[in-house]
Curated annotation (Swiss-Prot):
GO MF annotation list: fructose 6-phosphate aldolase activity
Designated name of the protein: Fructose-6-phosphate aldolase 1
Active-site feature positions: 85 (schiff-base intermediate with substrate)
Keyword Cytoplasm on entry: yes
Role played: Catalyzes the reversible formation of fructose 6-phosphate from dihydroxyacetone and D-glyceraldehyde 3-phosphate via an aldolization reaction.
Gene Ontology biological process: fructose metabolic process
Keywords, comma-separated and alphabetical: Carbohydrate metabolism, Cytoplasm, Lyase, Schiff base
Cytoplasm found in the keyword field: yes
EC number: 4.1.2.-
Catalytic activity annotation: beta-D-fructose 6-phosphate = dihydroxyacetone + D-glyceraldehyde 3-phosphate
Subunit structure: Homodecamer.
One cellular component (GO) term of this entry: cytoplasm
Length: 220
């Protein structure tokens, strides 16, 4: 299983990389724009925040296949082993095929259906990113889409992985993992929710209180 953070917040990545067994960091144009740092600045900073390890993902902005390929080359000039995110449009599928031929790893993004995701994998995408919560918001089932896509990739494109994205709750993320999803990327608020349990804090406080009462200290 691979766990990613979906953010461009360098400080948060550095802090959470101490805690989480991170495989890397994913970004998209909206995330980069919110951070107000250009790619050539923030991508190296994110790489350094992870101790020079882990995979980074960044997305193309062009809408034609040729433009997407040029964007991918620019991204690879910033971070040599970056995974290039390509929206799974008709032009995006063509770009994924072209990038596969160049040996540039890709992630098919903006996936709203299992068939769409399968096509990106067959075109050569190493990862496929279904938008779980956004599918739910449109009246579909994000978890069912992940389940179907996982089965399709297992049967027809076994070298590709589902990297589920767009979560609002830890439950959605866990349900994806239970469905067999190999990778997930979490926004910071959902990542924090996964390790924030008030009952745990209360239990630890009670342990300390009892130990202090018996031995006059809180150390062993």
């Amino acid at each position: 299983m691979e766990l990613y953070l979906d953010t461009s917040d360098v400080v948060a990545v550095k802090a959470l990389s101490r805690i989480f067994p991170l495989a890397g960091v994913t970004t998209n144009p909206s995330i980069i724009a919110a951070g107000k740092k250009p790619l050539e600045v923030v991508l190296p900073e994110l790489h350094e925040a992870m101790g020079g390890q882990g995979r980074l993902f960044a997305q193309v902005m062009a809408t034609t296949a040729e433009g997407m390929v040029n964007d991918a080359r620019k991204l690879r000039s910033i971070i040599a082993d970056i995974v290039v995110k390509v929206p799974v449009t008709t032009e995006g599928l063509a770009a994924i095929k072209m990038l596969k031929a160049e040996g540039i790893p890709t992630l098919g993004t903006a996936v709203y259906g299992a068939a769409q995701g399968l096509l990106s994998a067959l075109a050569g995408a190493e990862y496929v990113a279904p938008y779980v919560n956004r599918i739910d918001a449109q009246g579909g089932s994000g978890i069912q889409t992940v389940t179907d896509l996982h089965q399709l990739l297992k049967m027809h494109a076994p070298r590709a992985k589902v990297l589920a994205a767009s979560f609002k709750t830890p439950r959605q993320a866990l349900d994806c993992l239970l469905a067999g999803c190999e990778s997930i990327t979490l926004p910071l608020d959902v990542a924090q929710q996964m390790i924030s349990y008030p009952a745990v804090d209360a239990a630890v406080a009670k342990f300390e209180q009892d130990w202090q009462g018996a031995f006059g200290r809180t150390s062993i």
